[in-house]
A protein has these predicted regions:
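N-terminal accessory segments that position/regulate proteins before the catalytic core
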Residues: 1-178, 196, 219-267
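C-terminal substrate/ligand-recognition segments
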Residues: 200
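Structured binding elements
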Residues: 211
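Short pre-catalytic strand/loop immediately N-terminal to key active-site residues, enriched for Gly-Thr
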Residues: 186-195
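Short acidic/His/Gly/Ser-rich catalytic and metal-binding motifs that mark active-site loops
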Residues: 179-183
Length: 267
């Protein structure tokens, strides 16, 4: 059995990684930081301010232990307060640096925060089903479109993952390239992937601390998801998603969760 080879076995991944590699002859300190807005804000869309969030009272140690993937969700809505807590903990702005930089929980290359957050809402008290865009600087949600998201469509969109269709909310992280690539060139794409990972882990920990369930999603049809979210893939790219809701059983009880996934009673 031969050894694995990046170049031979996964040439597309190899080409991407080498194309964004740095050596002495092509390294630079990066360009000037471009003028940036705190984030995309379409304006004129129906607006929902976020309420006071649900409290996070779990210790860090307990939260880390509780963070597991949940693939069985109960048919119960989330509260808007729970959604507010999750959004603020993952990518919310605390205005520590004033209205321009808008410091947020995850580390970000150059402090440019190039990610955008879109919600596909099925069941949240206080929100109509549909697509919403989170605006951290104003701490609220723009309603991109009101629509019921059919279960078969969500399962299809996320490449046959049926648990997505049972979740209360799907969170979509997308990358607004102009915010960081102008400064860092193609290397900035790596930084965006890292930031998406940091952001999603923050989200996972907030969900765990609230006693809710979450599963991360890397498989989806990119262009169709972008159309649903109302984003232009020439300027903004979906990177990473997750489905969250109330778990049908304690997510840390792996035997119970696996039994639910199989559709059989526990024990």
């Amino acid at each position: 059995m031969r050894d694995f080879s990046f170049a031979d076995d996964v040439p597309t991944a190899w080409t991407y990684h080498r194309a964004t590699a740095r050596w002495l002859f092509n390294a630079s300190a990066g360009g000037e930081s471009p003028p940036v807005r705190p984030g995309r804000e379409d304006g004129g869309l129906p607006w929902t301010p976020l309420p006071e969030g649900a409290p996070l009272q779990s210790s860090l140690a307990d939260t880390l232990r509780a963070r597991v993937s949940c693939r069985c969700f109960a048919a119960e809505p989330l509260t808007l307060a729970q959604v507010a807590t999750v959004l603020r903990a993952s990518y919310g702005s605390d205005n520590r640096s004033g209205p321009v930089m808008q410091d947020r929980p995850p580390p970000s290359g150059g402090g440019l925060y190039p990610l955008e957050v879109t919600l596909l809402v099925r069941a949240v008290d206080g929100l109509e089903p549909g697509v919403y865009h989170y605006v951290p600087a104003a701490d609220g949600l723009e309603q991109v479109q009101q629509l019921v998201l059919p279960r078969p469509f969500l399962t299809y969109l996320f490449m046959g993952q049926p648990w997505v269709a049972e979740a209360a909310v799907v969170v979509v992280l997308s990358f607004a390239g102009g915010r960081s690539l102008t400064k860092y060139g193609d290397r900035g794409y790596r930084y965006a992937l890292l930031e998406a990972g940091h952001t999603m882990q923050n989200l996972n920990l907030a969900v765990a601390a609230l006693g809710l369930g979450v599963v991360n999603l890397g498989g989806f049809y990119d262009d169709e998801l972008a159309v649903l979210c109302g984003i232009d893939v020439d300027q903004e790219l979906p990177l990473y998603c997750c489905a969250l809701g109330r778990p049908a059983a304690d997510p840390s009880d792996r035997m119970a969760m696996r039994a639910l996934e199989r559709g059989t009673p526990d024990g």
